[in-house]
Amino acid sequence: IRELFPECERVASYASPASIRIRTEEELRTLRDKGLTMVYMGLESGCDDVLKRMRKGHMSAEIVEMGRKVRRCGMALSVTAITGLGGPELLERHAIETAEAFNAMNPEYIGMLTLMVEPGTPLEKWVREGSFTVLGPEDILRETELLLQHIDSEGSVFRMNHASNYLPLKGGLPEDRQKFLD
C-alpha cells in the first residue's frame, strides 16, 4: 500500500472476532508489516446474556481474546460498545461487564454509541411487540456512569462523541474519568 500510495498516513480495517480468529498471529503480523496499523472491532457488550439476545455470534471471552490477539501482533485496537443494548433488565450487568471486557483488552481506543433501533430489524420487532424496552436518556446516562466507574483501561482514549450519544465525552483513561463522572 505504501508503495502505491506513499501519501497514505495509515491503514486500518474493520474486523469481526471471526475474521481475526481464522488468521494466525503470523498472518496478522504480516498484515502489520505490510502497513495495517489499526483494527476496529465491535464488542457491543461484555455481557454474554446481551450478546446472546442480540445474536452477536460470539461470547465476551472470545471477543476479548481476539482483541488481545490483535494487540499481541502489534496493531492498535479500537473497540466499540453500545449503551442501552441490555435494556432495563440487564442495564447494570451490561455496563459493568462491558467495562470489564474493555479492561481485559486494554485497547488504544474505546468508542461508545447509543442504541438506535433501525426499522425492519429483529430489534425493532421486539420493541414493537414489547419484548424489548429502549432505555431513555436518564437510564443511558446512569449506564454510562456505571461503566465509567468500573472501567480501568490504562492509556485508552475514551470517545462517546457519536451523534447517537446524549452526552459527548472524549478523553484519556484514567486521567479524565473523574472529569467524565463530574
What are the roles of these predicted feature ranges?
Residues 23-24, 90, 169-170:
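A short acidic (Asp/Glu
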Residues 14-18, 44-48, 82-86, 115-117, ...:
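Active-site beta-loop-alpha junctions enriched in small/polar residues
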Residues 38, 61-122, 137-161:
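Conserved C-terminal portion of the radical SAM core fold
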Residues 166-182:
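Radical SAM enzyme core and accessory elements
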Residues 1-61, 65, 70-72, 152:
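Conserved SAM/AdoMet-binding glycine-rich loop
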Residues 22, 52-56, 84-87, 117, ...:
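Generic structural "secondary-structure junction" signal
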Residues 26, 54-62, 89-97, 131-139, ...:
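Alpha-helix N-cap and loop-to-helix initiation/capping positions
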